[in-house]
Amino acid sequence: MIYKVYYQNDQKRNPKREDTHSLYLEAPTEVEARALVEAHTEHNIEFIEAIEGETLAYEQQNPNYKLTEFSE
């Protein structure tokens, strides 16, 4: 499953919508997607959304779409 992870770069500052970023990640479950991001980044995760079907096709049209892979 592909997940879109919305996050802030810094865990110490209060989240601001204008500073929200996103990344795309392939993981078996939402819990595992969260664990991967937490283990490999300092991001403050706001929301994780499973995307598939037409939504995924739409996201893939964005030139900034790229699956993030973390090395173990």
UniProtKB/Swiss-Prot annotation:
| Role, per record | A non-essential component of RNA polymerase (RNAP).
* Domain of life of the native organism: Bacteria
Disulphide-bridged cysteine pairs? none
Similarity remark: Belongs to the RNA polymerase subunit epsilon family.
Gene Ontology molecular function: any one: DNA-directed RNA polymerase activity
Q: Where is the signal peptide?
A: none
Name the Gene Ontology biological process terms: DNA-templated transcription
Q: What is its EC number?
A: 2.7.7.6
What GO terms fall under cellular component here? DNA-directed RNA polymerase complex
The protein's UniProt keywords, in alphabetical order, are: DNA-directed RNA polymerase, Nucleotidyltransferase, Transcription, Transferase
Q: Self-association or partners: how does it assemble? A: RNAP is composed of a core of 2 alpha, a beta and a beta' subunit. The core is associated with a delta subunit, and at least one of epsilon or omega. When a sigma factor is associated with the core the holoenzyme is formed, which can initiate transcription.
**Enzyme class, one word?**
transferase
The gene that this protein is the product of is rpoY
- What's its catalytic activity? RNA(n) + a ribonucleoside 5'-triphosphate = RNA(n+1) + diphosphate
The name this protein carries in UniProt is DNA-directed RNA polymerase subunit epsilon
Q: Which Pfam families match?
A: RpoY
InterPro entries given in the database record: RpoY
